[in-house]
């Protein structure tokens, strides 16, 4: 039973990963006090069975996530859109940062897994909804 549940979870998570990877750009929404903040992101990586995003610790988004780790991601691709509501959990391990930077080598000009700025987060308690104008929404939890 556990193997089946774990396999289904990975398959569902992969669908979210594939959507965000294909879209290339997604929008990450946070909150700063009572003001919503949204900005484009482009990193998505699977590491140790979790979906990760990356930013820099010096950016306002890092402070916003620290104050309130509940975020929402939105992207549009091929006539469908996805919304992912989740909590972001920082993973400060060099291995997690290296995996992200290996997946996005163009970021190595600005980031390094051993610097004090590179920051990666994995998604926890995530609910993704894939919608379109022609089909019923698909809800994915991971």
Positions of the model-derived regions?
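N-terminal leader/targeting segments and the immediate start of mature chains
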Residues: 1-25
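Short, basic, glycine/proline-bearing loop/turn elements
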Residues: 2, 27-29, 42-50
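A short, Trp-centered hydrophobic/proline-enriched beta-strand micro-motif
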Residues: 18-32, 71-73
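A short mixed-secondary-structure module that forms the rim of ligand-binding clefts
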Residues: 44-79
């Amino acid at each position: 039973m556990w193997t089946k549940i774990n396999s289904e979870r990975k398959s569902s998570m992969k669908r979210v990963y594939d959507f965000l990877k294909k879209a290339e750009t997604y929008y990450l929404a946070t909150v700063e006090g009572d003001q919503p903040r949204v900005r484009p992101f482009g990193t998505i990586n699977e590491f140790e069975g979790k979906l990760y995003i990356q930013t820099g610790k010096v950016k306002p988004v890092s402070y916003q996530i620290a104050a309130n780790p509940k975020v929402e991601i939105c992207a549009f691709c091929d006539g469908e859109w996805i919304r992912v509501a989740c909590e972001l959990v920082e993973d400060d391990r060099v291995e997690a940062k290296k995996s992200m930077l290996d997946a996005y080598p163009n970021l190595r000009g600005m980031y390094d897994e051993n610097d004090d700025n590179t920051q990666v987060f994995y998604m926890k308690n995530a609910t993704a909804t894939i919608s379109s104008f022609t089909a019923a929404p698909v809800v994915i939890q991971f």
